[in-house]
A protein has these predicted regions:
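Alpha-helical transmembrane segments
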Residues: 1, 5-13, 45-56, 117-121
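Alpha-helical transmembrane segments in multi-pass membrane proteins
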Residues: 1-26, 80-81
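Hydrophobic core segments of transmembrane alpha-helices in multi-pass, intramembrane catalytic enzymes
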Residues: 8-12, 80-85, 145-152
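Juxtamembrane helix-loop-helix connectors linking adjacent transmembrane helices
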Residues: 25-92, 102, 107, 136-141
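Interfacial helix-capping/hinge residues at the ends of transmembrane alpha-helices
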Residues: 28, 98, 102, 153-157
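Small-polar-interrupted transmembrane alpha-helices in polytopic inner-membrane proteins
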Residues: 56, 85-86, 90, 112-127, ...
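Membrane-interface helix/loop boundary segments of multi-pass membrane proteins
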Residues: 92-119, 160-166
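Functionally important transmembrane alpha-helices
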Residues: 116-119, 138-171
Length: 171
């Protein structure tokens, strides 16, 4: 199912690229899948990564969406849970949100606004998923379903665009 998710999340950008942008750029460059070039100092890059991982750990602690699949496995479940988070969900989300949606919004509205808009859309997508899965929604869970993914989406967009010259590989 992980490979299928990556294919589906890549198909939408690919079809748009084929229809409208094929003559302008290579598909992988167009969505940000290229070797990153660091634009800032190691100190700034490290600070950004530490903040992102703090948000990621907080969301992992709060969220039961992924961890519930592995909760009966004990410590053995940590590795598959991380694989699901980083490979299946991470790659799919990066291609669609930072690589496709984010890059189009940045091209139209600039880096600051484009990064913020893709982050908010990323947060709303998590609320839509929670509603589709009939997960409980209350004010405290809104932090888990919207605010944390929005902050994470903003941080990842910032890391990609401001630190690594638009490459989505670091995120």
């Amino acid at each position: 199912s992980g490979i299928m998710q990556v294919i589906v999340f890549s198909l939408i950008p690919f079809l748009c690229w084929v229809i409208k942008y094929k003559k302008q750029d290579n598909f992988f460059k167009w969505i940000g899948l290229y070797k990153p070039v660091k634009l800032v100092s190691n100190k700034k890059a490290t600070i950004a990564m530490v903040i992102y991982f703090a948000v990621f750990i907080l969301s992992y602690i709060i969220s039961k969406e992924v961890s519930s699949n592995f909760e009966n496995m004990g410590a053995v479940g940590i590795v598959p849970s991380l694989i699901v988070c980083f490979i299946q969900n991470g790659l799919s989300e990066e291609i669609l949100f930072r690589g496709f949606i984010g890059k189009r919004l940045i091209a139209k509205f600039g880096k600051v606004s484009g990064i913020l808009m893709q982050a908010v859309l990323f947060g709303f997508m998590h609320i839509a998923l929670a509603l589709a899965m009939n997960l409980p929604i209350n004010i405290s869970l809104m932090v888990s379903y919207f605010i944390i993914p929005t902050i994470a989406g903003w941080m990842l967009g910032y890391i990609d665009e401001k630190i690594y010259n638009g490459s989505i590989i670091p995120s």
